[in-house]
């Protein structure tokens, strides 16, 4: 209860207000509140720890600090948005059940691997999966931060029917997200096994060195990140009902394929199920967004997606293979190799991204069918 207090406060009192703030392209408000809460929380934890306070009270203090965030969101919304009270009407949230269904499908997709490994494989493999998932999930969170405010921007342009500007901004976001994904995930592919080797040093309950599994799971998350602009367009256009089968199909494919492959190879099996399901959803959203929102050929989206995915896979596999023959004995060496890898991949990718962003404004006319 103590640990979950801040999350409870977020969903019970702050999520609607935060959604409104983000939709108005004021993500900086949330960032400022998050930074302030993190600083105050760090100071409070240090102070309570120095006072030798029990762990329960330390966690309670931390949760109470983060529980204040919804109140700040509420105060900001109340001051800047004079919202009238909505009467009873069926037009309000008319697609709420479809939205809930997609969230349930997403929840099933995200948790299928852990559940199946727990039920049908050695429980020790859950620990292996959790370590790799922790690292890759952190990289995914960093990548997703670059799409902040994207859906709100798309929604504004769709509402104003500014198709040319929507295409241009879509290609800019797509170029940025794909470039960031290629850099971060290819570096992660090269460095994740050496990191796990250091992180689990001295732990012998399971074999934590699983490079093939790591690359497959990494590709699944990378594909998911690269498709953020395409998956964000239907949400911005309020097309939840029209795209529901993409979410439902993703969950179904993941569950069915993972169940079929888990007896062949538990870790690789569930990772392949996740990757296949993610690719299906990505292609589905590319097809829908290209045809019904952007009005551009699917082939144009598929070519960029396939090229980026292939490049990422080659870089990650090559980096992983290269570092396998190098002894990395401590975190300092790992950081040095990480910086070298980031420089080698990041510099040319940054140049490509910069060049494409400059050219994007001239591609509007060529994107038409």
What is each residue range found by the language model?
Residues 7-32, 56, 77, 218-250, ...:
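Membrane-interface junctions at transmembrane-helix termini in multi-pass inner-membrane proteins
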Residues 55-62, 68-111, 115, 149, ...:
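Interhelical loop/hinge segments that connect adjacent transmembrane helices in multipass membrane
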Residues 5-6, 113-114, 127-146, 171-179, ...:
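Alpha-helical transmembrane segments of polytopic membrane transporters and translocases
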Residues 1-3, 189-221, 328:
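Interfacial segments at transmembrane-helix termini and the short loops linking adjacent helices
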Residues 22-23, 136-174, 230-236:
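Helix-loop junctions and terminal segments of transmembrane helices
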Residues 31-79, 91, 95, 102, ...:
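Hydrophobic alpha-helical transmembrane segments
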């Amino acid at each position: 209860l103590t640990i979950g207090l801040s999350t409870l406060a977020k969903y019970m009192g702050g999520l609607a207000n935060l959604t409104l703030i983000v939709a108005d392209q004021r993500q900086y408000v949330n960032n400022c509140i998050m930074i302030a809460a993190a600083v105050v929380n760090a100071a409070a934890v240090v102070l309570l720890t120095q006072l030798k306070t029990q762990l329960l009270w330390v966690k309670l203090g931390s949760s109470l600090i983060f529980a204040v965030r919804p109140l700040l969101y509420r105060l900001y919304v109340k001051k800047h948005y004079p919202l009238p009270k909505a009467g009873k009407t069926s037009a309000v949230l008319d697609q709420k059940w479809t939205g809930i269904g997609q969230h349930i499908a997403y929840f099933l997709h995200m948790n299928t691997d852990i559940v199946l490994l727990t039920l049908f494989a050695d429980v020790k493999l859950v620990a292996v999966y959790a370590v790799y998932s922790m690292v890759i999930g952190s990289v995914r969170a960093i990548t997703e931060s670059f799409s902040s405010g994207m859906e709100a921007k798309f929604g504004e342009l769709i509402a104003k029917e500014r198709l040319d500007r929507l295409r241009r901004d879509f290609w800019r976001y797509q170029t940025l997200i794909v470039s960031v994904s290629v850099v971060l995930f290819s570096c992660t592919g090269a460095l994740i096994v050496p990191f796990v080797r250091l992180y689990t040093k001295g732990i012998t309950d399971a074999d934590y060195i699983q490079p093939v599994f790591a690359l497959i799971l990494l590709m699944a998350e990378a594909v998911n990140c690269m498709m953020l602009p395409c998956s964000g367009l239907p949400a911005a256009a309020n097309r939840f009902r029209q795209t529901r089968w993409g979410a439902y199909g993703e969950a179904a494919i993941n569950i069915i394929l993972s169940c079929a492959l888990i007896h062949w190879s538990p870790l690789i099996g569930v990772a392949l199920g996740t990757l296949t399901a993610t690719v299906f959803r990505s292609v589905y959203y590319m097809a829908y967004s290209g045809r019904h929102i952007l009005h551009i050929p699917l082939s144009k989206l598929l070519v960029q997606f396939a090229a980026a995915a292939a490049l990422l896979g080659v870089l990650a596999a090559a980096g992983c293979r290269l570092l396998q023959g190098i002894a990395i004995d401590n975190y300092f060496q790992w950081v040095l190799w990480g910086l070298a890898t980031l420089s080698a991949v990041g510099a040319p990718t940054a140049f490509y991204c910069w060049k494409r962003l400059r050219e994007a404004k001239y591609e509007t006319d060529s994107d038409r069918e």
